[in-house]
Amino acid sequence: MSLLNVREYSNISMIKGPLIAVQGVSDAAYNELVEIEMPDGSKRRGLVVDSQMGVTFVQVFEGTTGISPTGSKVRFLGRGLEVKISEEMLGRIFNPLGEPLDNGPPVIGGEKRNINGDPINPATREYPEEFIQTGISAIDGLNSLLRGQKLPIFSGSGLPANTLAAQIAKQATVRGEESNFAVVFAAIGVRYDEALFFRKFFEETGAINRVAMFVTLANDPPSLKILTPKTALTLAEYLAFEKDMHVLAILIDMTNYCEALRELSASREEVPGRGGYPGYMYTDLATIYERAGKVIGKKGSITQMPILTMPNDDMTHPIPDLTGYITEGQIVLDRSLFNKGIYPPINVLMSLSRLMKDGIGEGKTRDDHKDLSNQLFAAYARAQDIRGLAAIIGEDSLSEVDRKYLLFAEAFERRFVAQGVNENRSIETTLDIGWEVLSILPESELSLIRSEYIKKYHPNYRGKK
């Protein structure tokens, strides 16, 4: 940083929430890093978020409590926020400013990078085609995640999204390249007990060695919450495109991120958009989600799994609605399955992976994968219709085939969707379980599966020549 770029002012005209207004600044840049020196000599940092008519608004990371409009100095540093990043960060826990939260030493090696990153040139993007095994049957079998994809999880209040996120972080891998796989885990505005759960889970399972955690708590200033996914993705980009690693970025909870955006927008007295959220929330979310992907000529990749809580389980709420426009599908957690004691309570009919078709099949997962998933979807959808009919006319009035569909639905939920927190299923195991639950139905009902796959994988024929 050149000292020639540093400008110092002392005329703070307003302090409101996490913002301060500085008069007389004519050349401030958006997202420029600012240093505030208090009368007692202590310092805080912030970013320029707006500048108009000679007044510049600065968002203070540590909050504005204790800042005095008289006696405080505001320095504009002529650069964006940079964080030192390195491979040393794997196995460690940091705040979004890159400062350790695990009582370990600061990062010594590595390099400083602007947390806003550089957008991937669309012409250099490579289409996702490699399967990532999460060990979760409802994802791997029916809504497969591909390397370079962005696939969010839509949860509801009280549903086990945290447990599922931790399990995926522990189990996910690109088969054959396990040693070259890393997880960047951003916990945004979580409660202290949730942050402690993630830390203990990763440490006790040994997954911490390949995980870099970035954490902000619920009582942290909104400006820090907004920085969390950006810093995490800056490390992900470094590991993927400089160190040729396959990186899975898990961002939880993006609802807290959007609430922080709304809080800052209200502090700036901006005209609210839909649901009271700022009108630029779609663009802001896109700057985060679009940092996932593969680049032609680079061995590494960034795969994203943003996780968000739907207020009132409403998928039409602005946060899940806008997220769905940007990402490539969604995994939806269902309260009725959760109330049945099924974990993970993934509603496969509401879930979708738009890129799945390009990452499954012979040479990628197994030759029967596509046919089997189509049949499981169709059979479960029909079973749900039959459940509704049975609730009206009673099971005794159903045909024999319809009653078998009811048995199939129960087995599908209890044996295919449900699995243990520490149960890591290979894709072969997942597909075999799918065949086992389908074997409840008459063979004549398996109209979406080619006969050669039935002869090869159906339990009635498996192992026979």
From Swiss-Prot:
SUPFAM superfamilies (UniProt xref): C-terminal domain of alpha and beta subunits of F1 ATP synthase, P-loop containing nucleoside triphosphate hydrolases
One GO BP: proton motive force-driven plasma membrane ATP synthesis
Database matches in Pfam families: ATP-synt_ab, ATP-synt_ab_N, ATP-synt_VA_C
One annotated GO molecular function: ATP binding
Keyword Transmembrane helix in annotation: no
This protein's UniProt keywords: ATP synthesis, Cell membrane, Hydrogen ion transport, Ion transport, Membrane, Transport
Keyword Ion transport: yes
InterPro entries the UniProt entry points to: ATP-synt_VA_C, ATPase_a/bsu_AS, ATPase_A1-cplx_bsu, ATPase_F1/V1/A1_a/bsu_N, ATPase_F1/V1/A1_a/bsu_nucl-bd, P-loop_NTPase, V-ATPase_su_B/beta
Xref: PANTHER family: V-TYPE PROTON ATPASE SUBUNIT B
UniProt record similarity statement: Belongs to the ATPase alpha/beta chains family.
HAMAP family, per the entry: ATP_synth_B_arch
The protein's name in its UniProt record: A-type ATP synthase subunit B
Species name: Sulfurisphaera tokodaii (strain DSM 16993 / JCM 10545 / NBRC 100140 / 7)
Gene coding for it: atpB
